[in-house]
Amino acid sequence: MKLVIVGCGRVGAALAEAFANQDNEVIVLDTSTRAFDRLSDEFKGQAIRGDGTDEDVLRKAGAEGADVFLALTEGDNRNVMAAQVAMEKLSVGKAVAKINDPVRAAAYAELGIATVCRTTMLADAILAFLSLGSSGMPAVIAPVPHVHAEA
């Protein structure tokens, strides 16, 4: 499977490592070369400095026709723009944008963009933990995934 990850923060780097370790073709883009310090020395994918919202940069990086495109920067708008470019111009199989503002999820879904909102996931995980009580619960709360996409 070919994956393109825009944003090599903690989430992007962790996913890049995990997918690369499963023998997938992984391309990671970030505007800062320092971000690639989060990747291990054994990282089997490509790390490319560039703007993940720029169609030409994405094409040169080999993103066209990727099976999965993950936009994981800290900016909702940047992630949605990158996912739109990937879907509309690069014919990727699936595109997901990480967002922080849950209010925007519905609007992005109307555009056909799948989103993962860490704000909603964290709130849901805490609510689930509190509603179940703490007896027998693990010290680490596992997130409940929420992916919003147009049906």
Where are these regions (language model features)?
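Cytosolic regulatory regions of ion transport systems
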Residues: 1-151
